[in-house]
């Protein structure tokens, strides 16, 4: 199944983040009027790839639900308009970016005896082995961060919103984690047979045969919306210049 493929038999992650820095300062978010504080969550993974997420707490918490906002390939503050919207509504917001983007690093590793900088998702195919799938880079940080939140907070529901690559993540992640109640995927995915234009081809993670032989996109849509109080909403804009 999906979890076995992603974590090669090790099971769904139960660990906690490698680092939590509480109440940090980031000038890029200074103008969010209902922002009380930011906690920085770092998850370290194989080949020195990391994930840095921000947990943004509202001054006035009017809702007891957590919003997971995934920027995709954009800079970590690229979704500030959407983040502001949810903060102003009184939600706590957990912000992620895709691997190798945003605040996440681009490590230099040894690959076939040469120093190689990881800066593109299509390089991940060279890291595959019988004991490791790079698909874990896309979903493990969310799982590990939610483990921390489970342990330290008592939110009623977790909802997820993502655009572009974040929209793809908002499809696959709820398919493997029942903790996500309602997911919104914006310009996030198309079944492979509908990708008739070059711009729709997608990166490594969008087209990996071994992954989609286990669960194709239709399967993922069902899995992401199956269960008590689970929903998946996909948004496609006809004149979308993003993706």
Task: Give a label for each model feature.
Residues 13-61:
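N-terminal cap/lid segment of alpha/beta-hydrolase-fold proteins
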Residues 45, 69-74, 237:
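Glycine-rich His-Gly loop
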Residues 56, 65-72:
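The conserved beta1-alpha1 loop
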Residues 63-66, 89-92, 155-158, 177-182, ...:
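Loop/turn elements at helix/coil->beta-strand transitions in domains of secreted/extracellular proteins
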Residues 70-140:
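Cap/lid segment of the alpha/beta-hydrolase catalytic domain
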Residues 97, 184-187, 235:
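Alpha/beta-hydrolase-fold catalytic nucleophile elbow
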Residues 143-206:
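Primarily recognizes the serine-hydrolase "nucleophile elbow" in alpha/beta-hydrolase
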Residues 191-243:
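The feature captures the conserved acid-bearing segment of alpha/beta-hydrolase catalytic domains
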């Amino acid at each position: 199944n999906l979890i076995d493929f992603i974590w090669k038999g090790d099971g769904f992650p139960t660990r906690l983040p490698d680092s939590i820095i509480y109440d940090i300062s980031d000038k890029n978010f200074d103008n969010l009027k209902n922002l009380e504080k930011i906690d920085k969550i770092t998850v370290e993974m194989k080949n020195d790839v990391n994930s840095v997420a921000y947990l943004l707490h509202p001054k006035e918490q009017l809702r007891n639900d957590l919003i997971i906002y995934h920027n995709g390939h954009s800079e970590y503050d690229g979704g500030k308009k959407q983040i502001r919207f949810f903060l102003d509504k009184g939600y706590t917001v957990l912000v992620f970016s895709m691997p190798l983007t945003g605040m996440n690093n681009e490590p230099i590793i040894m690959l076939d005896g040469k120093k190689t900088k990881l800066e593109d998702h299509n390089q991940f195919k060279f890291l595959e082995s019988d004991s490791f799938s790079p698909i874990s880079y896309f979903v493990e940080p969310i799982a590990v961060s939610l483990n921390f939140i489970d342990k330290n907070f008592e939110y009623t529901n977790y909802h997820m919103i993502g655009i572009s690559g974040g929209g793809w993540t908002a499809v696959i992640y709820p398919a493997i984690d029942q903790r996500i109640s309602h997911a919104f995927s914006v310009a996030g995915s198309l079944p492979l047979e509908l990708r008739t234009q070059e711009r729709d081809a997608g990166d490594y993670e969008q087209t990996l045969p071994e992954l989609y032989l286990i669960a194709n996109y239709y399967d993922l849509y069902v899995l992401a919306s199956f269960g008590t109080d689970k929903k998946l909403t996909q948004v496609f804009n006809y004149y979308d210049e993003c993706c």
